[in-house]
């Protein structure tokens, strides 16, 4: 988590996305800069994942935990999810390329933007500390959740139902806390710089999405079929190799 949140702390470099805020202009593609570098945690991160595979948790019970952070994890929490969930909290599913306070992504984006643009107001790191406090609590809770999932391994439908319900309940409670943090941060900025500062942020966020990326049409069904074929072929090869070894062992005996 610390690695994916890293913004070149402890080095002689500064995050590239801080360049414009420092009055140094917009980074130019292909141009070398001795000070500003591209950090792991940057505004282009849409989601951050950590996959924690656990031998003791069978595949029928999720196989392990995926820790998910929407947007850049700089000031966002990683929530734990099992691989057998059937649905996610509504705030994850909000669509749109403009700020929307019902969206988990846009809520985190707003918090990150406020911290980045007004570092003097948030230099105490209280927001990051709150995220880490939540994560520490969930890490402790995961031990019990793992045992519950293992106990339901022979009932995969029940395991999925429980994992889904717990995941949505945790996300709902967390999103309420994120909204409180967002409002507190916005109020702090408004008190110091006026409400117009928040409107400026709205305009900047919307302007950042005026240029659309033209995606080339791609047949994802084809690549999925190819992937399944490759996986099946690999499984057959492994089976044949193991069978050959077993036969060879019997002949040696």
State what each model feature region is.
Residues 1-221, 248, 252:
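C-terminus-biased signal that marks the final domain/tail of proteins
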Residues 221-241:
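Selective detector of the "anchor" transmembrane alpha-helix that sits immediately C-terminal
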Residues 235-253:
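C-terminal membrane-anchoring or membrane-association module
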């Amino acid at each position: 988590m610390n690695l994916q949140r890293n913004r070149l702390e402890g080095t002689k470099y500064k995050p590239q996305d801080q360049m414009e805020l420092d009055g140094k202009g917009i980074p130019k593609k292909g141009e070398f800069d001795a000070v500003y570098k591209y950090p792991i945690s940057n505004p282009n991160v849409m989601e951050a994942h950590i996959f924690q595979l656990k031998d003791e948790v069978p595949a029928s019970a999720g196989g392990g935990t995926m820790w998910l952070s929407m947007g850049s994890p700089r000031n966002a929490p990683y929530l734990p999810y099992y691989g057998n969930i059937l649905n996610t909290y509504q705030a994850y599913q909000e669509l749109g390329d403009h700020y929307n306070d019902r969206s988990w992504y846009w809520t985190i984006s707003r918090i990150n933007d406020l911290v980045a643009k007004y570092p003097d107001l948030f230099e105490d790191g209280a927001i990051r500390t709150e995220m880490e406090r939540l994560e520490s609590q969930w890490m402790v809770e995961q031990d019990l959740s793992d045992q519950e999932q293992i106990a339901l391994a022979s009932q995969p439908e029940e395991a999925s139902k429980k994992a889904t319900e717990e995941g949505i309940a945790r996300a709902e409670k967390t999103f309420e806390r994120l909204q409180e943090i967002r409002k507190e941060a916005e109020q702090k900025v408004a008190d110091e710089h006026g409400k117009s500062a928040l409107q400026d942020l709205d305009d900047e966020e919307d302007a950042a999405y005026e240029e659309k990326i033209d995606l080339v049409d791609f047949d994802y069904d084809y690549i999925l079929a190819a992937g399944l074929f490759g996986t099946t072929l690999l499984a057959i090869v492994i089976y044949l190799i193991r069978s050959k070894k077993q036969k060879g062992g019997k002949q040696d005996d």
